[in-house]
Design a protein with these regions (language model features):
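N-terminal small/glycine-rich loop or linker at the start of catalytic domains
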Residues: 8-25, 78-91, 114, 119
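Aromatic-lined glycan-binding groove of carbohydrate-active enzymes
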Residues: 184-224, 260
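Active-site beta-loop-alpha junctions enriched in small/polar residues
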Residues: 21, 51-53, 80-84, 120-123, ...
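Conserved, mostly hydrophobic/aromatic
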Residues: 6, 18, 33, 40, ...
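Glycine/proline-rich, positively charged
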Residues: 42, 86-183, 187
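Structural preference for beta-strand elements that scaffold enzyme active sites
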Residues: 15-17, 46-47, 74-78, 114-117, ...
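N-terminal binding-site loop/beta-alpha segment at the start of enzyme catalytic domains
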Residues: 1-75
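Terminal-tail/helix-coil boundary detector
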Residues: 218-252, 256, 271-276, 283-285, ...
Length: 332
């Protein structure tokens, strides 16, 4: 397993990390979740990413129980705030009160005194950015988080935060990024790098599409994410036949390189020095081990060129935000 420095922090994180949205929110049982987590440690993964909203606290609680049996300095733990945590729509967002309330609740569920990385899950344009930034800084000043990050912010929002608090405010950005979704390359990568911010990318396997498990003209496997109505909300475009046909053209490229489709997709993401870690989900331990094999793979220029030829104009390249992200900045 290779490790990379997370932005301007002193954290060294595995370039393959384990996320908990698929593992915990996808209905995977506790013992299977424990097995996936154990497999991650066996593979050298030391970076674990969750969020308060995953299962409305269930994901954090599960990892709190599982990870509490290991030395706290043996892993890097990240969580997020923003999502709606109850039936009350007001129980969400990035107000000072909500951030203060949710960090304490997250730490209780995670059974730890601090998280290594506390992230804004989305931007909240309904709250003055000054209030949000001051609240996040208070979390760090109180020792409840070591570093801060954000997910799915526009460059306008990132720049506004940096203008207020300086480039040392954030160490990480968490955008969607894969062969099929390249939106962060347009603007976010350059702004982040200029300010000491690394990328922790989610959905590097394109919601599983880049593993090759879905074929054009065929129904998705019954046990797959695409067949689960609770999990496939963001997959509509990815399941179009033209996208699946483009992904099918990657199959001989992976075969010739001696790689699985997943290894090819993860290595493609990790080719970028801006990326500190690629977050993968898992419902079975063998998936964790299989994805971890992508660490350290270097794709040749010929392979990279073949990928571009195969995908053509299929990937999203314009600066576009993922689901639920909102543009705009509010000031006091």
């Amino acid at each position: 397993m290779d490790y990379r420095r997370l932005g301007s922090s002193d954290l060294e994180v595995s370039d393959i990390s384990l996320g908990s949205w698929l593992t915990f929110a996808g209905g995977v049982g506790f013992e299977q979740t424990r097995a996936c987590t154990d497999a991650a440690f066996e593979a050298g993964i030391n970076f674990f990413d969750t969020a308060n909203v995953y299962g409305r606290g269930a994901a954090e609680s599960a990892w709190g129980e599982i990870l509490s049996g290991r030395p706290r300095d043996s892993y890097v733990l990240a969580t997020k705030v923003w999502g709606q945590m109850s039936d009350d729509p007001a129980d969400s967002g990035l107000s000072a009160a909500q951030i203060a309330k949710q960090i304490d609740a997250s730490l209780t569920r995670l059974r730890t005194d601090y998280v290594d990385l506390y992230q804004a899950h989305r931007f909240d344009p309904g709250v003055p950015i000054e209030e949000t930034i001051e609240a996040f800084q208070q979390v760090v000043d109180s020792g409840k988080a070591r570093y801060l990050g954000f997910s799915e912010w526009t460059t306008e929002q990132v720049q506004a935060a940096i203008d207020l608090a300086g480039p040392e405010l954030f160490v990480s950005s968490q955008p969607q990024y894969s062969m099929l979704w390249r939106a962060p390359e347009a603007e976010l990568f350059a702004l982040s790098t200029a300010n000491g911010i690394s990328q922790i990318v989610w959905s590097p396997l394109g919601q599983g599409v880049l593993t090759g498990k879905y074929r054009p003209g065929q129904a998705p496997p019954s046990d797959s994410r695409a067949a689960n109505s609770d999990m496939n909300v963001a997959m509509n475009r990815l399941m179009d036949d033209d996208v699946l046909e483009a992904v099918d053209r990657l199959r001989p490229i992976a075969d010739q390189a001696g790689l699985s489709m997943a290894e090819l997709a993860l290595a493609w993401v990790l080719r970028r020095p801006e990326v500190a870690s690629a977050i993968v989900g898992a419902s079975r331990p063998e998936q964790v081990h299989a994805n971890a094999k992508a660490s350290g793979i270097r794709l040749t220029p010929d392979v990279l060129a073949a990928i571009e030829d195969a995908l053509g104009d299929t990937p999203v390249t314009e600066p576009t935000l993922a689901t639920n992200a909102r543009p705009g900045v509010t000031h006091r």
